[in-house]
């Protein structure tokens, strides 16, 4: 939240052009292209559009290359929580509750795991199910490796118990989550999707800049026939799925309009439950069994609340070239609007500040990860638990004692608001235990 408030947005101009190109029937169709770079100032954008008024546009180069997309690994606890939030709108706690019911009824394997490995039984079952439903060309058995920091891999990845069972009986939530798990698991054992990506470079006769038009066509759908991975709403996905009309090198193009739109850099996105789980996993904080309880606890104690940000109005500039005339327009947009994000409360801010001041070592992101590593050493018999506890309390206990001794000088959870204008005495607010 502090990074967001401290963020300074920077403006630039994104230039897009719509060209009219004949299709296979000779009918003119629209083709979108984007300038290869962002322009830093309005004056620079204005100057480019002035050049375009009298310019000739020519296809300078066409490149076509094959592209392969591979499926994601089967679900771990973390990735299941993230994908269920994005695709189904489930909270982290809701996902674990439904997964628990599926596990207890024998529908899926254990749902608290950081492993992406599948047993040979599951791989063979997937292979058979894919071949029966879609044919042998869709089969591609795979073994995945876990890349998460501190992963223990005590269990298999989350998968259906019987791969041939595509649907189950149960509640609507159970059916949805099972369907998600089944598709993800099946897709992980399917062939790559094969695509062809085409990029056309368009030159401007009186300027050094170029426009790029890109298109993508699926040659073989592979795993995409079953499953497409979702992304957080704050991750911008390029729209390259459109097809390009027939083009040839040296072809002259006619523009319909060219637009320079003022755009702004965005502040770091606030966390959703799903993106917070991903961050916890990246930092090595906690285990699959603790992600959901951690996120629930900080909300129950009102350190964090889930809510929406309405956003603010912002003016932005649009310069348009159409029919050889340049128009300059100022428009309004809403920026910063966010839905279902985790927002820190005043209580959470005060508690965090207090802990950062008096217990910085425990608040360090590496603390939990290092403790988890020490637990692993205890489990493997390399270290005695008493040694680790003594080392920890040797520094922790004095910190607690010194903090208690100082609490009369600075009350726990206390924030100074200022001086009373009548009495001149300091006014403060104190927050209770939680």
Where are the predicted features?
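Residues within the DNA-recognition helix of helix-turn-helix
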Residues: 98
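Basic, low-complexity terminal or inter-domain segments flanking catalytic cores
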Residues: 3-6, 12, 45, 63, ...
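A conserved hydrophobic secondary-structure block that centers on an alpha-helix together
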Residues: 81-83, 87-95
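C-terminal helical "lid" subdomain and adjoining coupling/linker elements of P-loop NTPases
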Residues: 1-44, 87
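Eukaryotic nuclear/nucleolar intrinsically disordered, charge-dense low-complexity regions
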Residues: 105-108
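Conserved alpha/beta core segments of nucleic-acid transaction machinery
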Residues: 42-71
